[in-house]
Amino acid sequence: MPRPRSATCWAAAAGRWSCRLLALLLLLLLPGPSGGSEITFELPDNAKQCFYEDITQGTKCTLEFQVITGGHYDVDCRLEDPDGKVLYKEMKKQYDSFTFTASKNGTYKFCFSNEFSTFTHKTVYFDFQVGEDPPLFPSENRVSALTQMESACVSIHEALKSVIDYQTHFRLREAQGRSRAEDLNTRVAYWSVGEALILLVVSIGQVFLLKSFFSDKRTTTTRVGS
């Protein structure tokens, strides 16, 4: 029995909407063009690590960093423009964020220094955002406003970006907390072993001291013949 024409048209329209929705969801999941660098690296003691980024004039940039493990969880940070002018400089910071607008074209340099530390190396995370993310649906060559579905996709996209940022910060906090807990656990273990050794030495000393109190002291008399 042939299907009614209205039912066929309805099924075709539903199929087109399903395909369009699937395409939009895939667009949300695809990684967009990267607008910065996000790196976690090891910084040895008495060491300095620098990174370079080409930036065009007028671009808004944000540098955010945090020390995850090592020592007092602090590091020196310095940011310079292409002419060597210092834009940002902080000493022994655990975490910080700095936003600036590039005043000229060229290669900008930012360095992390652990030269003040002699024994401990650090694990440093930084996120250097250059410019703003491009819109999900570019406005060029568009003759109509965003549809309700496209607006919903834009809202979902922004919410997912916020979720990613929150997850990153929570992972950093978890890693730093775990490092502090492991460091505290190591110190407690060493302190416990030291206390046990001290108690053992004191106990042995008390045993020998008490033994010396109750030991028989015999004196020998030597008779000298005339």
From Swiss-Prot:
GO biological process, one term: Golgi organization
GO cellular component: COPI-coated vesicle membrane; COPII-coated ER to Golgi transport vesicle; endoplasmic reticulum; endoplasmic reticulum membrane; endoplasmic reticulum-Golgi intermediate compartment; endoplasmic reticulum-Golgi intermediate compartment membrane; ER to Golgi transport vesicle membrane; Golgi apparatus
Bilayer topology annotation: Single-pass type I membrane protein
Positions in the Lumenal compartment: 36-189
Gene3D superfamilies for the chain: GOLD domain (2.60.120.680)
Motif COPII vesicle coat-binding: where in chain: 213-214
Annotated localization: Endoplasmic reticulum membrane; Golgi apparatus, cis-Golgi network membrane; Endoplasmic reticulum-Golgi intermediate compartment membrane; Cytoplasmic vesicle, COPI-coated vesicle membrane
Chief place where the protein resides: endoplasmic reticulum
Cross-referenced SUPFAM superfamilies: Supernatant protein factor (SPF), C-terminal domain
Residue ranges occupied by any GOLD domain in the UniProt entry: 48-130
Source species, domain of life: Eukaryota
Signal peptide span: 1-35
PTM: N-linked glycosylated in complex form containing terminal sialic acid.
Membrane-crossing residue ranges in chain numbering: 190-210
Residues on Cytoplasmic side: 211-226
Family: Belongs to the EMP24/GP25L family.
PANTHER family to which the protein is assigned, alphabetical: TRANSMEMBRANE EMP24 DOMAIN-CONTAINING PROTEIN
Function: Potential role in vesicular protein trafficking, mainly in the early secretory pathway. Appears to play a role in the biosynthesis of secreted cargo including processing and post-translational modifications.
Name of the protein in its database record: Transmembrane emp24 domain-containing protein 7
Chain's gene name: Tmed7
